[in-house]
Amino acid sequence: MKKYINVAIDGPSGSGKSTAAKGLANKLGFLYINTGLMYRAYAYFLNENNLDINTNETACIEAIKNARFIFNGDDVKIDDQDVSDILRSNDVAMLASVVAANAKIRNLATNEQRKIASENNVVMDGRDIGSIVLVDADLKFYLNTSIQTRAKRRLAQNKDIEKLDYESIYNDIKERDYRDMTRDIAPLKKAIDAIEIFNDNMNLDQCVAHLYEIYLNKIKKS
């Protein structure tokens, strides 16, 4: 019999799923797992070591296996170096989309994510959590937001990290959406049993409160 409660939250880049997932996890007292940071960490690590997943897959996989990655919510360390802020840059986001399309890397990450979920009450966010990683999750959400709103949010979030303009961010998000939705391996899509939430007109507190209310209605009453 299943011992732990798993909540899956999926959605496109910049939809606020990670922030909402963290807020919901805190409200529930659950472990929060940001799977997107795993792929960003892998992408950053490979780029820093001049390794290209498209030209030297074996070396990339071995390098990742031999490195020490520590994931704790939004905090990430690679071989004891804190890279949490670096991973939020737009450049790393684009690199991560390419790395995440690799089947062997996704398999490596998916196995780790499933192991964590089997040992904890978790709120896990990503792009294929409800459809691939945790198909038996107790509750699945799909957060959706217009590209315009996502671009404005990312511009505000990254203003102290890098100099970007709205148009370049908009185009990057549009390109990433296309890649994520059309890739052969674990494409971004809403699980058939996921509850879709459009959050353009919600602030963080409203979004978390809405997810929490649904959780109480779906899980607590079951």
UniProtKB/Swiss-Prot annotation:
Alphabetically, which GO biological process terms does the record hold?
A: pyrimidine nucleotide metabolic process
Give one GO molecular function term.
CMP kinase activity
**Localization:** Cytoplasm
What range does the record give for the signal peptide? none
User: Pfam families from the entry?
Assistant: Cytidylate_kin
Give binding positions for ATP. Answer: G11, P12, S13, G14, S15, G16, K17, S18, T19
Q: What are the record keywords, sorted?
A: ATP-binding, Cytoplasm, Kinase, Nucleotide-binding, Transferase
Q: What's a GO cellular component annotated to this UniProt protein?
A: cytoplasm
Q: What class of enzyme is it?
A: transferase
Catalytic reactions of this protein: CMP + ATP = CDP + ADP; dCMP + ATP = dCDP + ADP
Q: From which domain of life does this come? A: Bacteria
Q: EC number(s)?
A: 2.7.4.25
* Entry-linked HAMAP family: Cytidyl_kinase_type1
Q: Which NCBIfam families match?
A: cmk
The family assignment reads: Belongs to the cytidylate kinase family. Type 1 subfamily.
Name under which the protein is recorded: Cytidylate kinase
The source organism is Ureaplasma urealyticum serovar 10 (strain ATCC 33699 / Western)
